[in-house]
């Protein structure tokens, strides 16, 4: 289904993100989708991501974790996972000189507006207010991005886009990248740490051999994808799994469900970092809308997990505050409270 964009499309007036940021690679299919996505393909390749952003991400992760190290306790989503996702995406888009709090404010406004549109913006005054605030946030972000497009810094992934897309098109796609790059990467890091700290045996394997961290991240993505569902819209009458679907029907795909398909994964509800086929997960979707930022998200998660385990000795969950992933669409723990040793050996 995710491969068949002709029958199940994202290009539909009900697509809430497009109402906020305009048409982008996320909300288009076919030739229009290809034209919007193509200029971003090279800068988002693994080698480009590593060359442009690995050193920055490593330094930023070290700074964030070192800042909390003396305290012996903390909440990792807000102290590390979220701030790292914000600063890396700001750097990636050429907004590295912008206050991260400002970038987060724009992001929060856009997210609230997308959620309001999805819930029918006119239904309540609160939704209408969120839509208005989101439009203002996107306008401010757009103004900053226009300056970047006019003179992109070398690290900006927008440097290769200039000329291939109009300024408005580049900005719409940058807005989508900001939205996805913060929300899902924050969840990806938080979920990976929750899974490791909840599984002492698997954690011991990683501590003994840090080369297993990428495998742990893939297994975490399988068990709890940060984006659990995606929507598609039927373009014609069809059948799917024995169900009759009419043209115009909205079809919600459960990525989380597919990732626990017992026909594909043995013991699918267990966290096993040595699972041989964990990478067959669909956490980054599939087909023409496979996540463009997958390499960047993996880089951030790998560095974040490695830095946390390296700098925070005897890292463990704070049992006074149970944590579990929450959310229908985007899933992550609301709080991830942990403790660690501050003793100097």
Feature locations, PLM:
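Cytochrome P450
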Residues: 1-345
């Amino acid at each position: 289904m995710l491969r068949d964009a002709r029958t199940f499309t994202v290009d539909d007036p009900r697509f809430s993100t497009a109402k906020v940021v305009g048409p982008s690679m996320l909300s288009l299919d076919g030739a229009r989708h290809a034209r919007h996505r193509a200029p971003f393909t090279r800068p988002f390749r693994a080698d480009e991501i590593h060359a442009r952003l690995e050193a920055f991400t490593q330094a930023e992760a070290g700074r964030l974790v070192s800042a909390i190290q003396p305290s012996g306790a903390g909440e990792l989503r807000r102290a590390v996972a979220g701030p790292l996702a914000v600063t890396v995406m700001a750097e990636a888009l050429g907004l590295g000189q912008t206050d991260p709090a400002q970038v987060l404010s724009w992001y929060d406004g856009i997210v609230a507006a997308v959620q309001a549109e999805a819930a029918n913006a006119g239904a309540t005054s609160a939704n209408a207010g969120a839509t208005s605030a989101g439009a203002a946030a996107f306008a401010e972000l757009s103004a900053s991005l226009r300056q970047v497009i006019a003179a992109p810094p070398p690290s900006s992934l927008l440097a290769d886009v200039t000329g291939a897309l109009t300024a408005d098109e580049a900005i719409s796609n940058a807005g989508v990248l900001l939205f996805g790059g913060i929300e899902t990467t924050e969840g990806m890091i938080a979920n990976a740490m929750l899974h490791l700290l909840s599984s002492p045996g698997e954690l011991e394997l990683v501590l003994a051999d840090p080369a297993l961290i990428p495998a742990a991240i893939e297994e975490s993505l399988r068990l709890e994808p940060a984006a659990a569902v995606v929507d598609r819209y039927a373009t014609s009458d069809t059948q799917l799994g024995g169900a009759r679907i009419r043209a115009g029907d909205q079809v919600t795909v459960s990525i989380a469900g597919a990732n626990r398909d017992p026909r594909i994964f043995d013991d699918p509800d267990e966290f096993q970092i040595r699972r041989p086929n964990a990478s067959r997960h669909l956490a980054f979707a599939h087909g023409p809308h496979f996540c463009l930022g997958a390499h960047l998200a993996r880089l951030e998660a790998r560095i974040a997990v490695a830095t946390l385990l390296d700098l925070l000795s005897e890292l463990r969950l704070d049992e006074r505050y149970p944590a579990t992933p929450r959310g229908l669409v985007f899933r992550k723990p609301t709080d991830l409270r942990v403790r660690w040793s501050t003793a100097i050996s």
